Amino acid sequence: MVGGGRTGIHLLLGFLIGAALALFFFSSTPSIDLTSSLAAFTSCQNQETETNVLEPSALEKGRVYKDLSEHWIVHQDDMPAPPHNQDATPKVTRTRFAATELGTRERVMAAVMAESALALSINATLGRHVPRVHLFADSSRIDNDLAQLTNLSPYKLNGQKTHSMVLGLLFNMTVHNNYDWFLLAKDSTYINPFVLLRMIDTMNWNEPVVMGEAAEDGSGRCRLDTGMLLSQPAMHALMNNRNACNNFALAADDDQLAFEKCIQIATNLTCKPLHQGVRYEVWRGAERADSPAAHDSIEDWKHSPAFKRALAVPRLLSDADASALHDYFVRVEMQRADREIIKMEAELSRLAEQEARETGEAISWPPALPPYAKPPNRYQVSTWEYFTMTELFRSEPNQNVRRLEGKDFDDVAEVVVAARQQVESEEPELEFVQLRNGYRVFDPRRGMDYMVDLTYRKTVNEMPEVDNRFESDNEAAHEESLKEIVVERRVHVSRMIASTQLMNQAPYVKEDTDVTVVIPVASEKDVLPARKLLARQARLCLFPTEEARKTRMVVAVFPLIESRSVTAITNDMEELKRRCKRSLLETDVLPVHPAVSTEGKGTAAAAALDDAVDRYGANTIYLLLSPHADVQKEFFDRARINTIKHYQVFFPVPFVEYHPTISGMEMTEKEEKETPTEQAREAALSRLRDGVEPKRKRTLIVQKEHGRFDSQDFSCFAVYGVDYVTARAKFGQNERRNDLISAFLGQDSIHVLRAVEPTLRIRYHKRSCDMESIDTEDIARCLDSKKENVAAKDQLAKLLFHEK
C-alpha cells in the first residue's frame, strides 16, 4: 500500500504540473486559438492575392512561417480488404485455359465432306500432318468402316441443303476451339499436307480471304471440288451470316453449288487464287473423263514442276489414287528436306570457319556442334572405351573386359559400316581387311564420338613404266612388280544427339511415411548376424529423440530356425522396443512358411515380403534388409524419400566388406606394423586352410582396402506394398531366385533408382547361390558378385604370390 501510494503521488504531481503549464502558455478558449491558427494559415496561402479571410491576431503577426512541404514524402496505405461476404468490387471473369486468354490457336483445321469410302484414305493421309481433320457425312451414306472414326460428325438433311447442316456443326465446334485457317474440301480431292503447311506458315491469317480456284462462270466464287482455304476472319463472317444463305438458296442448285454460293454471300469475298505472293495450285491432269487413274499417271506427271507444287489434285477414283499420290509427295518432301540439309550444312561450315577465324580457336567437327567439354579437374576427365569386334574394354575397377554383345555390338557394327563407307567412297581401290582399334566416348553436349582404325589391303606397282617391244615380257614383268601393302585409315565418327526429351516430373515426396523393416532369417547361420543387426539398432537409440514417424522392425523367422534361436531373437526385439520407445519403434517376429527351398536369397525375401504385406497392409514402405547389413540412421530417411508410390523403387548399392583375413583386417594397425610381411602372409594362409571363422579387429569404414560398392548386389531394397504386389505377379509361387530385381525391370510405370549408399554396409559372410534358379542371368549375377567380393586384386596377389 505504501509503495503504491508513493508511485501514484509522483504520477499525480507530474500530471498537475503539466496541466498548469498548458493553461499558462495557451489560451483556454478553443475557438480563439482555432481562429488565429486558421487566419495565419490562410494569410500565408493568400499572399499573392492579398485577400485574407480571417484577420490574424497580434501574436500570429509576429510569427514567420516556412514552407517545408517540398521535402515531404506522401505514403498512401492500401485500404483494408473487406470481408468476403461484403465485397462489392466486380470480379474479373477469367477464361478456363491460358491458350484462350492469350489468343493462341492451332494453325489449321481441315473439314472434309465425306461422300464415299475415299474419306478413310483422306483422313489417313491428311490426319498425320494436319493438327485437326474432321469429317462431315450424311447419315445415310455412313458405312461400318466410316462409322468407326472418332472425328466424324453425321447429319440428316431433312430436306435442307448440305451447307446448312455442315456450317451449323462447324459453328458448334469453333465456339471454344478456333483456328487460324480452315480448309474445306471434298473426299474426292487429294490435299498435299506439306504444301498446305508451308502456305499457312507464309501467309498472315488476320486478313479476311477465301483462297481457291475460281469458278469458270466468272461469278467470283471458289470451287468446292478443288478445295478452298479460309482465314479466321473470313470463317468468323461465314459463321455469323450462315443463316442468310437460306434466303438466296435455289431449289435447282445442287449441294456443291449451293455451298459455294453460301460462302460467297456470307463472307462477301471474291475467290483469290493468289494471296500475299502465295498461289493456290491445283493439278488437273485427270480432269477428262477418259483420263487414266491418278496412280497410273504419276510417272507421267512427275516430270512437271507444277505437279510437284500442287496443293490439290481433284477427281480421285479409288483408295489407290490417294495412297499413290501421298507416297509420291512424301518422296518429294524428303528430297526437298535433303536439299535443305545440304544447304544448311554448308552454311554451318561457313559460319564455323568464320567463328574460328574471329576467336582463333580450332574448328569444331561436326560443324555447329560444341567442342569437347573441358573437365574442371583431372578426376572428371572423360574416359574413352576401347573396343574390337568381339570385346569391349570399360573403365571399371574390377572388370576390364566384357564381351561385345547386345546393343553395344549393334552400335559398334553400325559405326564400322559408316566408317567403311566413308573410306571406300574416297578410295575404292582399297580392300577391307579388319577393324584394328576402336574408341568411343560420350559427351552430353555432343553425343557419342568414335575413333575407328581400319586395316585395308592395297595392290601397288613398284616397277616404273618403260617401253618394251615385247608385250609378253611387259605382262610378266608387270605381274612380278605387283605388291600388296597394308594401309591404315583412321575415321572419326560422331553420333549426334538427335532429340532430347524432358522426363516427367517426379511426384512430391515427404519423409513422414511409415516404414516396415523386414529382416529374413532363413537358416541358423543368419541368426547371429540378425541379432548383431538388432544390437546395433539398439545402440542407435542410446540418445533418443522425439520421432513422429513410425518404424516397425520385423524379423521373418523360417521353419528351419530352432526354438531357442527364436526365443533369443524375441528377447532382443523386446529390448530394442524398450530402448527405442521414444522413437515410435515397433517390433514383431513374423513366422514364415515358404512353399519351396529358400537357399537363394531372392526366394527367402519373396516369402518374407509376401507374409509381411498380408499382415501389415500394402500402403506402407517395406525395407528389405539382409541379416548381414549394417545401416545408419540416415539410411531410413533416404529410403523414405527415394521410394515413391506407383512410381519408383529404391535399390541402393551397398558397400560390401572383403574377407577380413585376406584384406588384413584381422590385425590392428599396431599388430600389422610389428608383424613381418611374410609371417602375416603365412598366418593368413594357415587360417584360410583351416577354415577359421574370420574376426575383424578394425572398424568397418568405406575404404577400398575394406570393401567395394557392389552394383550386382540387390539384397536390400525399399518398395511400397502395392508396387510389390504388382511386381510379384511376374513370378510364380514356386520359382527359386537369388534376388528380386528382375520383377521390377521392364515396367513402364515403375522406375528403379540405384544409388551408391555409404550408410548401408554388408558384413562379410559366405554367400551361397541357388544354382536351380530359373533365370540364368540371376545365377551369373550372383556368381560374379560372390567372386568379386572376396578381396581386391592386389590383396589376392600379395597373398598368393611370394615377393622375392
Curated annotation (Swiss-Prot):
Chain ranges on the Cytoplasmic side, renumbered to this chain: 1-6
Domain of life of the organism encoding this protein: Eukaryota
Keywords for this protein: Glycoprotein, Golgi apparatus, Membrane, Signal-anchor, Transferase, Transmembrane, Transmembrane helix
Reported consequences of knocking out the gene: Viable but sterile, with reversion of cytokinesis during early embryogenesis.
Pfam families registered for this protein in UniProt: CHGN
Assigned EC number: 2.4.1.175, 2.4.1.226
Catalytic activity: 3-O-(beta-D-GlcA-(1->3)-beta-D-GalNAc-(1->4)-beta-D-GlcA-(1->3)-beta-D-Gal-(1->3)-beta-D-Gal-(1->4)-beta-D-Xyl)-L-seryl-[protein] + UDP-N-acetyl-alpha-D-galactosamine = 3-O-(beta-D-GalNAc-(1->4)-beta-D-GlcA-(1->3)-beta-D-GalNAc-(1->4)-beta-D-GlcA-(1->3)-beta-D-Gal-(1->3)-beta-D-Gal-(1->4)-beta-D-Xyl)-L-seryl-[protein] + UDP + H(+); 3-O-{beta-D-GlcA-(1->3)-[beta-D-GalNAc-(1->4)-beta-D-GlcA-(1->3)](n)-beta-D-GalNAc-(1->4)-beta-D-GlcA-(1->3)-beta-D-Gal-(1->3)-beta-D-Gal-(1->4)-beta-D-Xyl}-L-seryl-[protein] + UDP-N-acetyl-alpha-D-galactosamine = 3-O-{[beta-D-GalNAc-(1->4)-beta-D-GlcA-(1->3)](n+1)-beta-D-GalNAc-(1->4)-beta-D-GlcA-(1->3)-beta-D-Gal-(1->3)-beta-D-Gal-(1->4)-beta-D-Xyl}-L-seryl-[protein] + UDP + H(+); 3-O-(beta-D-GalNAc-(1->4)-beta-D-GlcA-(1->3)-beta-D-Gal-(1->3)-beta-D-Gal-(1->4)-beta-D-Xyl)-L-seryl-[protein] + UDP-alpha-D-glucuronate = 3-O-(beta-D-GlcA-(1->3)-beta-D-GalNAc-(1->4)-beta-D-GlcA-(1->3)-beta-D-Gal-(1->3)-beta-D-Gal-(1->4)-beta-D-Xyl)-L-seryl-[protein] + UDP + H(+); 3-O-{[beta-D-GalNAc-(1->4)-beta-D-GlcA-(1->3)](n)-beta-D-GalNAc-(1->4)-beta-D-GlcA-(1->3)-beta-D-Gal-(1->3)-beta-D-Gal-(1->4)-beta-D-Xyl}-L-seryl-[protein] + UDP-alpha-D-glucuronate = 3-O-{beta-D-GlcA-(1->3)-[beta-D-GalNAc-(1->4)-beta-D-GlcA-(1->3)](n)-beta-D-GalNAc-(1->4)-beta-D-GlcA-(1->3)-beta-D-Gal-(1->3)-beta-D-Gal-(1->4)-beta-D-Xyl}-L-seryl-[protein] + UDP + H(+)
Assembly: Interacts with sqv-5.
Stated role: Has both beta-1,3-glucuronic acid and beta-1,4-N-acetylgalactosamine transferase activity. Transfers glucuronic acid (GlcUA) from UDP-GlcUA and N-acetylgalactosamine (GalNAc) from UDP-GalNAc to the non-reducing end of the elongating chondroitin polymer. Required together with sqv-5 for the biosynthesis of chondroitin. Chondroitin is involved in organogenesis of the vulva, maturation of the gonad, and neural development. May have a specific role in unc-6/netrin-mediated dorsal guidance of gonadal distal tip cells. Glycosyltransferase activity is weak.
Protein name: Chondroitin sulfate synthase mig-22
